[in-house]
Amino acid sequence: MANQKFNAQIIVTGLVQGVGFRYFVLRNALDLDLVGFTKNQYDGSVLTVAEGEKYQIEALYNKLKVGPMHADVRDIKISWQSFTGEFSTFEIRR
């Protein structure tokens, strides 16, 4: 039986724009074989939507709690959604 897939929306706030955060997300998501996207939000946060197995998404979440060297993560929220299957790769959206 195949492992169940999930969709998660992760919102990270703090000093997370202009510090390479989206590229950090991209690199880690690809390493974890996740699909979805990450993008800057107008309020200064970074939104990530990821699909994959739960342990993969949780591993990404744990990496995003720390972030890249010049980031200052103040808060991170995760919201679990139903798997959509709409993504075939992981990308940075503008």
Q: Which ranges hold each PLM region?
A:
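Intrinsically disordered, low-complexity, mixed-charge
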Residues: 1-94
